[in-house]
């Protein structure tokens, strides 16, 4: 349907658009990793008694049908059950349903069909008993209005057997800024998931980690867009390949004589809406069809602008789940604040709600930016900053510091030098090595471009000497350069005079341990000011001089 519409365009831009689409090889995983669902067809229908008893006929081919009334009204069917409270968890082929009646808790599947779980749940209750904004596979909350009952009744009979679904994401724990050494930091991906597939597991003792349940994951992509380090990224295809596809699409469009290209990122799930939008938009609007809108991040948006695009739009709907709208709006607002600093219209990157097309055309930006950088290399942040620096140079933007919103993953770290003991707790938890030691002397150093504002360093500092400030430093050299936040002369060992630790740390330890039974004597207190080798030598010399002293503690 979409291809047919695009082929009908006869304008020069329309022909260039079709040439670009036909001559750009889409990069996708041919054999992606998958997860499998096993469904025997045991179906649970939840809702008011009168309603659920009426809709069993279209599902007569299912292995079994169990009815669960939520209004307590009497019914006529023998497979009808009642409950005061209901708890549902799971996914296609593995729905656990626990009900409580008169204070007694029961596994409904065991009571109704002699198994542990149901395979499919058709939920006719008004608000739905599972809260995920994007329903898990096998769960049909038609009482909430989507999907429609007719569509659910048509699909449910097909859900018997074994089904494979792609693993949409890759997780690289080494890049994750969520937790380190018992300290919790970034939780952007957990907050961004509308399907309930991500969670933080662990404890302060064992450490926390991000877990992705592949059976719940629906491939929405908000987590990948929100992740500042690319620890979690979309895999069908991966972000770098998507970016290359957009860059080559634009190159082919220009090669065919097209002008002022506008990239319209569309979801493959809503082809009819995409067609409606393209019917009213000009022929220089090029659709880029992806699985989900949020799977394409801010780095790809700006990569399009530095490769000839005059604007990047998202073909969105106000019927999308609230979390998807929130994350997309949050990221686009961030991009628009950067565009404003560059002196570009904020609509250069914008969300086009398809419902608004009834009211008129959106603001279209068609001023060429004069950049064609080609493939951008590096990780997500490196690609983004390459694009931003190129735009800043071309547009003669002021190399100043721009304050950003509190949620921004860009910024600086400030250190109160009078409180810092250079213990390096912050360095130990920093996931990107934005904070790092000097190596040859006691010093804390910082690279602003690498800081993701995860807050781990601030929480880990025992002296509360650090603070984080979200901002973007448009001075490339200053942003990429190494800054010394705090530096001291090293303390020298009292015996061998070897530099071995920051003087402030030695002073702090002597102050805190003075009066402790193990450091009651001046000699014992002085050992804190010795290097590790001399400390041992001094202890054994004291023991040799007075062997009974060690028994007095």
Language-model region placement:
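Mobile, glycine- and charge-enriched loop segments
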Residues: 260-294
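Short Cys/His-rich "knuckle" micro-motifs
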Residues: 197-203, 225, 231-237, 438-439, ...
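Long, compositionally biased charged/polar accessory segments in the mid-to-C-terminal portions
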Residues: 285, 291, 310, 316, ...
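Helix-enriched interaction subdomains in cytosolic or periplasmic regions
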Residues: 1-21, 201-204, 208-245
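Short linker/helix segments within small regulatory modules
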Residues: 204-210, 440-445, 483-487, 507-528
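Long C-terminal interaction/binding lobes of large macromolecular proteins
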Residues: 286, 309-310, 317, 327-353
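Ferredoxin-type iron-sulfur electron-transfer modules and their immediate structural context
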Residues: 1-64, 68-192, 196, 260-272, ...
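Cysteine-rich micro-motifs
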Residues: 214-217, 221, 448-454, 521-537
